[in-house]
Amino acid sequence: MAKRVHIFDWHKKNAKKVEEFAGWEMPIWYSSIKDEHLAVRNGVAIFDVSHMGEFIFKGKDALEFLQYVTTNDISKPPAISGTYTLVLNERGAVKDETLVFNMGNDTYMMVCDSDAFEKLEAWFNAIKRGIEKFGELDLEIENKTYDMAMFSIQGPKARDLAKDLFDIDINDLWWFQAKEVELDGIKMLLSRSGYTGENGFEVYFEDANPYHPDPERRGEPEKALHVWKTILEAGEKYGIKPAGLGARDTLRLEAGYTLYGNETKELQLLSTDIDEVTPLQANLDFAIFWDKEFIGKEALLKQRERGIPRKLVHFKMIDKGIPREGYKVYANGELIGEVTSGTSSPLLGIGIGIAFVKTEYAKPGVEIEVEIRGKPKKAVTVAPPFYDPKKYGAFREE
């Protein structure tokens, strides 16, 4: 049976399309993907992303443990702020892309992908058990995925909405910085973050989930429903719209962001395979802090020394056509790779995509061809984002 978020019943009643995604039954759109997409680029929309995974790491050894199981330097950001970091397997392949918040008092919260939290829970606990063979750890790992509600408010008008709701200016926060706030007595964490390329904020708080896998922990989501409706009501003057996962995907693709399972992945195998993706291949080495030990580091160093045969590149269509995952990519008649994500940009009105290609072609300005329905269609590689960052995005010119 598919998993469900706290206010699934509201989505089922109000969304035009609800279907399974990564094991969760989720709203795909309410009005249309294009309508919700443009609401984020030009105004504001709210997403229920309570299907994302959350873990709490607590104890004197929490920081050292997280430094070992993730790639970035978790020790730098002060409380309360987050770090974008990766979890790798021993072969250097990406198990997931995560966000880790330093909550203070030896406590950290990790946010991970919806289809990764179960395997990460098993992974972290296995590592913890292995370390404890050499001595006890002061560390508790708690999976809060089914308990935590998470709403993402995105778009240029999100700043105004945050001022109205919480009396804070999110532009005073750096990216991934967070604050503890209240809404009608409901305490929550607010972070300046998102997955759309636009300015925005996300709120986290615990509530009962009527679809919790443990029957004894089920209950009515009074807080989640109240917060959701309150944000929608407060955002009416800004034209707020509820948005589904369809728009979330087209928005992240326009921004040039990777998606686990498409651009980053690991095989559930015990042998190296080219279908596994490392941070070096996915252009995610900005999330690696090399001056520490972490799982997968040795494999990455070897790969860096050997050379990287293929890398991610972004491209836009010149000819008419919509690229899709798995479509073949050519240059000068030579097969050089395949598409990992593709769509028709609701903002630009053209086909855009991301592909894995031979490294020599992974740079802007290269003319390529994408095989669409058996026919080669012209395209050109570009640097992300696909939109003009002076007109759109979190750092657009006012």
Curated annotation (Swiss-Prot):
Enzymatic reactions: N(6)-[(R)-S(8)-aminomethyldihydrolipoyl]-L-lysyl-[protein] + (6S)-5,6,7,8-tetrahydrofolate = N(6)-[(R)-dihydrolipoyl]-L-lysyl-[protein] + (6R)-5,10-methylene-5,6,7,8-tetrahydrofolate + NH4(+)
Biological-process GO terms, alphabetical: glycine decarboxylation via glycine cleavage system
GO MF annotation terms: aminomethyltransferase activity; transaminase activity
Annotated EC: 2.1.2.10
Cellular component annotations (GO), alphabetically ordered: glycine cleavage complex
Alphabetically ordered keywords of this record: Aminotransferase, Transferase
Subunit field text: The glycine cleavage system is composed of four proteins: P, T, L and H.
Family membership noted in the UniProt record: Belongs to the GcvT family.
Role description: The glycine cleavage system catalyzes the degradation of glycine.
Name of the featured protein: Probable aminomethyltransferase
Species name: Thermococcus onnurineus (strain NA1)
